[in-house]
Amino acid sequence: MRLAFALYKYFPFGGLARDFVRIANICHQKGHSVDVYVMEWNGEFNPNYNVHLLPCENWSNHGKVASFHQQLNEKLLAEDYDVVIGFNKIPGVDIYYAADPCYIDRFEKITFAQTLNPRFRFYAGAEEAVFGPNSKTICLMISDKQTVLFKKHYGISDDRLVMLPPGIDINRRRPDNAGEIRNKLRTKYQFNEQDNLVLMVGSGFKTKGVDRALAALAALPKTLRATTHLLVLGEDNLKRYQQLAAKKGVKANAHFMGGRSDVADFLLACDLLLHPARKDNTGTVILEAMVAGLPMLVTEVCGYAKHVLESKAGEVLMSPFSQQSLNEKLPEMLVADKKMWIKSALDYADSEDLYSMPEKAVDAIERIGEELSHAD
């Protein structure tokens, strides 16, 4: 089949981008042609894809996205693709991979003034075009919580929803030489075995709750704080958060490592995953920590927080978020014996399907492609 994938921006350290690549790679391996339409592509081009850059100039983000939608529609009309897959909410796609949360749910009450706001009208309209009753788009869902919200707001029928399991890379599972990798990384960055290493992973530091983590780090008892280090992997305004760390008196304890390709090694080298996100459709890093045997402390708003509760591989901060609760729970977990959390995480990783999302997504793409060809 001739497949077209559309997403606004590609950068190699984004969760959505990683999901796209894994799905597109399987499509290519199965003999399908892969065309990709983007506004921006950061990093090396994949030789297996035909990448089409659609530059969009506008003073506003929603204006750029609107330009992308228009250009994309013109390109698609000129081509004869069997299936068009959107990784953002794009009107007219055959399939939408639902990586983003429900937009209109963030508004408790939609006011008349909001309906006049061009930004609101654009994004609400794009979401309606994908999930609304007049749409034929099939939605690949990765979050139970978000599925409930989309049903609530749009009444989307079950026959337009495909629930996918998580898609953790099997290579992230704890290897036999985990101890060796742990020691090597700690030595490389001059940490000793007695140091408590707390890991955060993800770009978009405000959304991921890095400020919350810095506040909790600063609140640790002095002796515990002296041996505790927060390692933040991801891309954002590093200078701003380094200044925040200095303001809170934990500059020496907070290490901003940037976007990285060796996250798996850090999952093995650290003692705790901290993910106090303000919102997260899934929270893929939660399950990456799970399969690596790393205990975790996460907020309930994350889609994958349910797996922490089911596995008993860590602790969940219930909503509404309380900084005081985080400040109390972090030192408790740092000084606790972590053996049971580690065992629970690895047992859960062995018994649950946390891995097959890309394969199941491709199965859905192929099935929908067959149905569309018969409909023609």
Segments from the language model and where they lie:
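A conserved mid-protein helix/loop that constitutes part of the nucleotide-sugar donor-binding site
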Residues: A17-R22, N196-A219
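Aromatic "clamp/platform" in nucleotide-sugar-dependent glycosyltransferases that forms part
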Residues: G259, R278
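A short hydrophobic beta-strand element within the catalytic core of glycosyltransferases
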Residues: L273-L274
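Short hydrophobic beta-strand element within catalytic cores of glycosyltransferases
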Residues: P295-T299
